Amino acid sequence: MSHFSKIKTALKDLDLLKQSLNDLAIKWYVKDNIVKGYKDQITFANIVIPQNNNYDIGFVWNGVEYQLVADLQFWQQPWSVEFFLNKLTQRYAYNSILKMANDTGFHPVNETVKENGLIKLTLQRWRP
């Protein structure tokens, strides 16, 4: 028997979530807002990520954060659930830092991605 699982995240900003999914080349939509599961089960999601097997995954707002919602038995992404969330969270943090930096007058001057995936970002404030 299969069912939807909801996994907590630290993702709170919908625009940053969308941008981070785009950065990872993950196709998503908000058109129908329905995640399809096993035996025609459905649940609401703010963002839907279609899968080739027709068992979608998505993100739903719980009032505090966006939770990943999926029927994990039918997970069909290039990464495991844990790795997917780690990559997405890293990208979300990166985009969040850039947004906050830009809002406070900073801009990136150097970025290095290490072999282990660690991103080193150097910011600078422009002072006229």
Curated annotation (Swiss-Prot):
Keywords: Chloroplast, Plastid. Its main location: plastid. GO terms for cellular component: chloroplast. The keyword Transmembrane helix does not apply. It comes from the Eukaryota. The keyword Chloroplast applies. Belongs to the ycf35 family. This is Uncharacterized protein ycf35. It comes from Guillardia theta. The lineage of its organism: Eukaryota, Cryptophyceae, Pyrenomonadales, Geminigeraceae, Guillardia. The gene is ycf35.
